Regions:
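Glycine-rich adenosine-cofactor-binding loop
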Residues: 1-10
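Conserved S-adenosyl-L-methionine
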Residues: 11-16
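Glycine-rich phosphate-binding loop and adjoining beta1-alpha1-beta2 segment
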Residues: 24-56
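Conserved SAM/SAH-binding loop
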Residues: 66-73
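Short amphipathic alpha-helix with an adjacent loop that forms part of the alpha/beta core around
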Residues: 73-81
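ADP-ribose/adenylate-binding Rossmann-like module
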Residues: 85-90, 102-125
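A charged, well-structured terminal subsegment
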Residues: 143-159, 164-174
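Single conserved hydrophobic/aromatic residue that forms the stacking wall/gate
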Residues: 183-192
Length: 192
């Protein structure tokens, strides 16, 4: 989600952008992520996106941070520049919630992407306040965490109303031996 959102913002002509992503392109990313090509496997996603965005808009001022966001570096990141808007596409709960909380605390506009894994019906994608979402485990977990942090403010999110297909979930390990969930989609001939 992050790569697609960032590219659309770049194509819209934004003048400055910060890209934060410490991941490298993996073969399992090719089915869904913008920077993932056979020629980019093993490269930093942030560097691949930066080169792409400079090719789209040579005048864009990019700040590229190949780091994982953690509680400790999020305030520093948000205080290092004047941000008009934050697009959150983090899929790990703790840094996602902390980025949301710190952005709201600083009155920085933010939109957050919720879970779409094991879902395939694009007609069920919605834009709503996080407090109005349903059938989304990530939204529920984020709401709980925000409540613990005392945050009950509105937060625009993109989510899916579709219930996840448990048959489409596979547990695997990534390059750092962290457990990952992979999602499969039905082939076009299997969808009705």
């Amino acid at each position: 989600v992050g790569g697609y959102a960032a590219e659309m913002i770049c194509r819209a002509g934004v003048g400055r952008m910060t890209i934060v992503d410490a991941d490298t392109v993996q073969p399992t990313n090719i089915n869904r992520q913008l920077p993932a090509l056979h020629s980019t496997i093993g490269k930093e996603k942030s560097a691949v996106l930066a080169a792409r965005f400079k090719d789209i808009n040579p005048d864009i001022k990019l700040r590229v941070l190949p780091v994982f966001l953690k509680d400790g570096n999020i305030p520093e990141l948000l205080d290092a520049a004047q941000y008009d808007f934050v697009v959150d596409a983090i899929d790990t709960l703790a840094p996602k919630c902390y980025l949301i909380a710190e952005s709201l605390k600083r009155h920085i506009k933010i939109v957050s992407s919720m879970g779409a894994g094991a879902k395939s019906d694009i007609t069920q994608v919605r834009f709503a306040d996080i407090w109005d979402t349903y059938h989304c485990g990530l939204s529920k977990a984020v709401r709980k965490r925000l409540q613990k942090l005392g945050i009950k403010r509105k937060l625009p999110v993109v989510f899916s109303t579709e219930q996840a297909d448990p048959k489409a979930v596979l547990l695997t390990e990534d390059e750092q031996n962290k457990n990952c969930l992979l999602y499969t989609s039905p082939s076009p001939r299997d969808t009705r």
